[in-house]
Amino acid sequence: MTLPPAFFVGANLPWIRYGGDFGANAWAPAGLSQHSEPDRIASLFETLRAHGITTIRWFFLCDGRAGVRFGADGFPDGLDDVVFRDVDTALSWAERAGLGVLPVLLDFHWCMPARTVNGVQLGGRRLVLSRPSGRQRLIETVIAPLFERYGRDSRVHGWDLINEPEWVTLGVGTWNARKSILRPAMRSYIRDAAACAHARVVQPVTVGSASSRWLGLVKGLGLDFYQPHWYDSFESRAPLAMPVEAMRCDRPLVLGEFPTRGSARAPDVVIEMARAAGYQGAMFWSVLADDPATDFECAREALAAGVRRT
């Protein structure tokens, strides 16, 4: 996202159907371009805009279940034939409501142990990120084409290279070698993908970090802003009130996720604490995720109550 000069509030959509919004798979011949209820989504987006939201964080390729063609070696060979059509649809819906999109290219589930459902592999792609040849194929055949097509599109407010990579980085968020890659490999992916972006896009580039305590994983890799997440379980080691200047980052910070359910702090309190700490914005979790951290009505009430946005 192009960071505004003053504090802003955004929203994690984060998907309409996890892994199924962009590209074809066993469940649908396409993603959003063949969605059965576009009017419902349009109404939802208008509601977000009416509450002052200008940017939505949207997961694109997720765990690799759709949108990417893989070769016999398990490495990417390119985007499938409907991805661009689906992205065009997403951006069109957002534009009509006056929203911009922050695409999240990959989720950490990309690296989790593979599962097969209805003949579709979910996850199990960690070698793509751990091996130099896999990273090169991913960036050249999947990520670069997205940057080239949408890198100057004003409806795209930024690019998130991977969501919460710490959970699959050995020695950072996990010690399970079966579902992780080495720290140097993850840093290489982020560095190379950021360099690819800077050669092709005008929007800023970021990574959704699981916690501010792990920002060291992504520092010094060419990101344009840092995007730590905050949940109550991290409070003891990464307090929400910690001043941004104490984190010694060379770029601005945006609070990329915070819970709207199950937290000791109400959404409006989190937003004001983030503002006071020096963040440039905060994006609540979430609008449509069906999980214990999501309460969209609670978020709406907080915004309607007058959380100041500029």
Language model regions located:
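Substrate-binding cleft of secreted/luminal carbohydrate-active enzymes
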Residues: 9, 57, 249-310
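Short, well-ordered alpha-helix to beta-strand connector turns
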Residues: 223-224, 250
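Active-site mouth of glycoside hydrolases
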Residues: 2-223, 258, 262-263, 277, ...
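His/Asp/Glu-enriched short active-site or ligand-binding loop at hydrolase and phosphoryl-transfer sites
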Residues: 229-234, 283-285
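Substrate-binding surface in catalytic domains of secreted glycosidases
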Residues: 234-242
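Mature extracellular/periplasmic domains of secretome proteins
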Residues: 215-220, 241-247, 270-276
